[in-house]
Regions:
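Hydrophobic alpha-helical membrane-insertion segments
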Residues: 21-47, 170
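Single conserved hydrophobic/aromatic residue that forms the stacking wall/gate
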Residues: 1-6, 10
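Membrane-interfacial catalytic/cofactor-binding modules of polytopic membrane enzymes
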Residues: 37-82, 117-121, 125, 129
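Hydrophobic membrane-spanning alpha-helices of multi-pass integral membrane proteins
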Residues: 57, 61-62, 84-95, 106-115, ...
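Alpha-helical transmembrane segments
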Residues: 97-101, 141-157, 179-184
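Alpha-helical transmembrane segments and their helix-start/interface "positive-inside/aromatic belt" motifs
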Residues: 11-26, 105-110, 156-164
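Small-residue-rich transmembrane alpha-helices that serve as helix-helix interface/gating elements
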Residues: 189-201
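Membrane-interface capping segments at transmembrane-helix boundaries
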Residues: 145-148, 205-219
Length: 225
């Protein structure tokens, strides 16, 4: 019989069949009873006969692309000049004041200056596409920009959960706005959400290392032999 912490590990069993059954029930319900799922899985426009003389007033992408579509629409000339430019300047100052290596400072300042110059020289449509692509690619930088000394959220400061919670809410709001027709208030919210989305990742090297972390038990640490 295992003892102490090891016994707890054996008690915490994962029932794979239960999880698979729940997934198959939900999957089958959608496939057989609601394949269009309110127009989000299969868009209503796909069921309308094509009319070459008439363009639909509003075209929205599939639901899993809508957050990034909101980023695309949020990038306007005003957003680049009055939102992103001040943010990038403050970001460069933060790097200059905290980075240890001179090469990091030089690369950051050069990149910020190049981006700001590009905002003035290239139209916003181009930067909208760049922003949409960057919103996807920035997810792959997580292993390098997360400077937390522990991996599990269980041992991180409590306010880190609030940061992740705000990010999830922002992502869902961007997804909702992506399926709605554009209007002034929605565009403003999308701009705020876009700025918060990128700030979450760009500031992660700092905020992920802040706070009081709990000590990690020996049973969950790996020591190479």
């Amino acid at each position: 019989k295992p003892s102490s912490a090891a016994s707890d590990v054996y008690k915490r069993q994962v029932h794979d069949i239960l999880g698979v059954a729940v997934f198959l029930i939900a999957f089958s319900a959608i496939v057989f009873f609601a394949p269009e799922f309110g127009g989000y899985f299969l868009e209503y426009n796909n069921f309308i006969p094509a009319d070459p003389l008439k363009t639909p007033p509003h075209i929205a992408p599939v639901w899993y692309f809508t957050p990034y579509y909101s980023v695309l629409r949020a990038v306007t000339d005003d957003f680049l000049m009055f939102w992103m430019t001040p943010f990038l300047i403050l970001y460069a100052l933060l790097v200059l004041g905290t980075a240890r290596y001179t090469s990091v400072k030089v690369i950051t300042v050069a990149a910020v200056l190049a981006l700001i110059a590009g905002f003035f020289l290239i139209e916003a449509k181009f930067w909208g596409v760049v922003g949409m692509g960057a919103a996807v690619l920035i997810l792959f930088t997580m292993p390098w920009i997360d400077h937390s000394p522990v991996r599990s959220i269980r041992y991180r400061p409590g306010w880190h959960k609030w940061v992740y919670g705000v990010f999830v809410v922002v992502f869902l709001v961007l997804g909702y706005l992506g399926v709605q027709p554009p209007e002034e208030l929605r565009n403003l919210v999308a701009k705020i959400g876009t700025l918060l989305y990128f700030a979450f990742f760009m500031l992660m090297p700092w905020w992920s290392a802040m706070g009081e972390f709990k000590s990690v038990p020996d049973r969950v640490t790996f020591a190479a032999h």
